[in-house]
Amino acid sequence: MADITDLTGVISTLGIFIDNGTTGSPDWQYACAINSRSFNETRNEQTTTVVAQCGPGAPVETWRTAGPRDWTIQGEAALELEAFAMLRNWMEVGDQKKVRVVYYSGDKNELQAVGYYEGAGVLLGLSINQPDGNNIPSATINISKGAGSMPWTAGAPA
């Protein structure tokens, strides 16, 4: 039976960072201690209708190719005050920010960066919910692709 406690060679953690810098130099901040997160990549489909043969009544075919790539980030967490201020301001201003999604491998105390995606993103949703009882409120964020691409870079960010 496999050792499920050994996370070496397994994507074990996603780190979501936002460049909150106001000058030319980046100020990467961990979005929050997101305990439930996802990075979703999709690709649209492009179709072209072509006539398969010449002549009246000729059959028509639809050819499909890969279209533009898109992505979204979603997560839920209890927010630290600094992260809440950053996300609240981002939602109010509505601008694009650089987003970095780092894929880590290994145990939470010895994480090794496998690689990361980095590109412009737009904060589309920020909702905060207070559960019943004495539980801590949690925030849900939804970030979507901004202008440009989000290329993959192997290894740890510089």
Give the location of each predicted region.
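Glycine- and charge-rich intrinsically disordered segments
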Residues: 1-2, 158
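Residues within well-ordered beta-strands of beta-sheet-rich folds
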Residues: 74, 102, 142-144
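Acidic glycine-/aspartate-rich tracts in secreted/extracellular proteins
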Residues: 80-82, 148-149
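Mixed-charge, glycine-accented linear interaction segment located at domain edges/termini
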Residues: 118-158
